[in-house]
UniProtKB/Swiss-Prot annotation:
Protein family (similarity comment): Belongs to the LolA family.
Location (main, coarse): periplasm
Protein name as annotated: Outer-membrane lipoprotein carrier protein
Top-level division of the source organism's lineage: Bacteria
Record's keyword annotation contains Repeat: no
Assembly and binders: Monomer.
Entry's Gene Ontology cellular component terms: outer membrane-bounded periplasmic space
Any Pfam family the entry gives: LolA
Subcellular location: Periplasm
Signal peptide segment: 1-22
Length: 208
């Protein structure tokens, strides 16, 4: 599920200094200012370690500050992920199941968190290396399940991102029809619980 959240690419020279990494991270943060809200179509291609295509798909992605996320895979099998800034909902229509998680616990495990987070604490968990129009984001935690996320821009517009996991699978997402979130689109970030579904609530409970 981490990979889906990334929904959902490396090779950084060892001679790069910490200052260079910091500058690259700041450049990415500056670029993301222009992506404060985004709605886009995506096409997904997943290849294994042998570069064999093992999955394709398409759908809609939306992002908005602060901490709002919408992912709707429409083909080949429907699934949906919605984050309202507090909770994250994962809906599998085929299984008729909804999983609810704490937003911070779920999204912070993924470098995609940087697309919806602006706080220094979150950014300090990743190293960023700029390569032409792309930025490679690597988690500092060795057990994250993700090796690298690469996000690419053209004229400051997010055009694609790739996710490489620790099993060698590469998920490539090509974006099109990018738009700024409208007032009507804000409803995307409010999950409406379907009827007659099983609910797996994994949110952390406050202990009395």
């Amino acid at each position: 599920m981490k990979n889906l959240l990334c929904a959902v690419m490396l090779t950084s020279p060892l001679l790069y200094s910490t200052a260079v990494f910091a500058d690259d991270a700041q450049q990415l943060r500056n670029t993301l200012v222009n992506t404060a809200s985004l709605k886009t179509d995506f096409k997904q291609t997943v290849t294994d370690v042998n570069k064999k295509v093992i999955q394709t798909g398409s759908g809609i992605l939306a992002l908005a500050h602060p901490n709002q996320f919408y992912w709707h895979l429409t083909s080949p099998d429907e699934s949906q992920i919605v984050a309202d800034g507090k909770d994250l909902w994962i809906y599998n229509p085929f299984a008729e199941e909804v999983v609810i998680m704490d937003f911070a616990e779920a999204i912070n495990a993924s470098p995609i968190a940087l697309l919806v987070h602006r706080d220094d604490t979150t950014w300090s968990q990743y190293s960023v290396t700029k390569k032409q129009d792309c930025y490679d984001i690597r988690p500092k935690a060795i057990d994250s399940g993700i090796v690298t996320v690469s996000v690419c821009f053209k004229n400051s517009q997010l055009t694609k991102f790739n996710v490489l996991d620790d099993k060698g699978n590469l998920s490539q997402f090509d974006l099109s029809n990018q738009k700024v979130i409208t007032t009507e689109d804000k409803a995307l970030f409010k999950f409406v619980l379907p009827e007659n579904v099983d609910i797996d609530d994994q949110r952390l409970k406050t202990l009395n």
